[in-house]
């Protein structure tokens, strides 16, 4: 605990006075699933109708009838636990189950080609410093920035009084796009643009809607105990839509960017400190293709400027806070260090919502 306190004191005052921490909740996995999210919903009722209405604007009109009809029918394909959680959220919020399910599969429906995608992006960074510590930084950028800031929450998923895994997510959303299994690994998801509407729809039917990516990440965090197991699951499993899945572990070279198509990994790009590849930067572009993304270029320049020898959690915050890595669409920033003895506490304390 003393080490955690020292590290937190060293976080720079790059976070402006308007930055704030997300609300923290414990989701008790020993409770009936239909009751787990009740307090979260009660605390955010005033924001929920606006979020749902805004979400509808980002579903292309040709897809809207299918999406909302299908969303009201497909929860039966999810695990029983997820089904019951969704029904509980719908009941507590007073919103139709179709709208709740639709919110939770929005990424999977909308992750199509760049010409039609709404403003969705992220920056994920994994770095190994000279002491061997693995540090995972993440900015989540999203077009509904102001609305999402009001419903961003930090959740510890607890069983038998012990934190099993943690995640940054949103009220109404029981999946996870940014998370950590304490003492083992952390994960973040970035959008990857590949294919067209019909490709996602066909894959959804093929998988019988069983694997929305946010539910899958949560499942991996709960059931895959190690970095190696998690990377294997993230690389091999069929998913609805393309994505970049970034994973950080606790041992040498345990950091990877998995560029996913719908079937499996299209590319796996790991840390390799022996070849001086001590950091990985992923935004929303394939790392093996030429591209001019200013966020990625700036992050790489900043990492090289700071250097590996003295790189630490404070340094990662500095990279995440540099414009345009941090930009007008950034909802929150976080730093995860899964190898810390108090990694769950650190994750909770090292997340901030931008003003």
Swiss-Prot record:
It catalyses: N-hexadecanoylethanolamine + H2O = ethanolamine + hexadecanoate; an N-(long-chain fatty acyl)ethanolamine + H2O = a long-chain fatty acid + ethanolamine. Gene3D superfamilies: Penicillin V Acylase, Chain A (3.60.60.10). N-glycosylated. Autoproteolytic cleavage at pH 4.5 gives rise to the alpha and beta subunit. Cleavage gives rise to a conformation change that activates the enzyme. The same catalytic Cys residue mediates the autoproteolytic cleavage and subsequent hydrolysis of lipid substrates. It is a peripheral membrane protein. It holds the Pfam family NAAA-beta. Belongs to the acid ceramidase family. One of its GO terms (molecular function) is hydrolase activity, acting on carbon-nitrogen (but not peptide) bonds. It comes from the Eukaryota. InterPro entries: Acid_ceramidase-like, Acid_ceramidase_N, CBAH/NAAA_C. It is found in: Lysosome; Membrane. This is N-acylethanolamine-hydrolyzing acid amidase. Degrades bioactive fatty acid amides, such as N-palmitoylethanolamine, to ethanolamine and free fatty acids. It is an enzyme of class 3 (hydrolase).
């Amino acid at each position: 605990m003393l080490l955690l306190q020292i590290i937190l004191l060293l976080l720079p005052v790059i976070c402006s006075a308007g930055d704030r921490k997300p609300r923290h909740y414990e989701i008790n996995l020993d409770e009936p699933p239909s009751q787990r999210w009740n307090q979260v919903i009660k605390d955010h009722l005033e924001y929920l109708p606006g979020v749902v209405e805004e979400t509808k604007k980002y579903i292309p009109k040709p897809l809207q009838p299918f999406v909302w009809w299908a969303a009201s029918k497909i929860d039966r394909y999810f695990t029983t636990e997820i089904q019951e959680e969704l029904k509980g959220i719908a009941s507590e919020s007073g919103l139709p189950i179709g709208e709740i399910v639709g919110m939770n599969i929005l990424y999977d429906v909308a992750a199509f080609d760049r010409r039609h995608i709404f403003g969705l992006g992220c920056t994920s960074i994994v770095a190994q410093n000279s002491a061997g510590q693995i540090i995972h930084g993440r900015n989540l950028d999203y077009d509904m920035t102001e609305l999402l800031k009001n419903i961003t929450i930090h959740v510890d998923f607890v069983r038998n009084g012990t934190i099993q895994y943690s995640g940054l997510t949103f009220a109404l959303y029981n999946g996870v796009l940014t998370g950590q299994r304490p003492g083992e690994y952390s994960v973040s998801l970035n959008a990857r643009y590949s294919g067209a509407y019909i490709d996602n729809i066909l894959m959804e039917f093929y998988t019988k809607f069983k694997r929305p990516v946010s539910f899958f990440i949560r499942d991996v965090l709960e059931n895959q105990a190690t970095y190696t197991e998690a990377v294997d699951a993230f690389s091999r499993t069929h998913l609805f839509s393309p994505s970049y899945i970034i994973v950080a572990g606790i041992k040498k070279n345990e950091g990877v960017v998995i560029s996913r198509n719908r079937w499996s990994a299209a590319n796996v790009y790991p840390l390799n400190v022996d070849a001086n590849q001590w950091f990985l930067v992923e935004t929303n572009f394939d790392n093996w293709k030429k591209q001019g993304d200013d966020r990625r270029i700036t992050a790489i320049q900043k990492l090289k400027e700071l250097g590996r020898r003295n790189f630490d959690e404070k340094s990662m915050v500095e990279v995440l806070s540099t414009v345009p890595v941090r930009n007008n669409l950034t909802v929150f920033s976080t730093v995860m260090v899964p190898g810390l003895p108090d990694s769950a506490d650190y994750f909770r304390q090292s997340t901030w919502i931008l003003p």
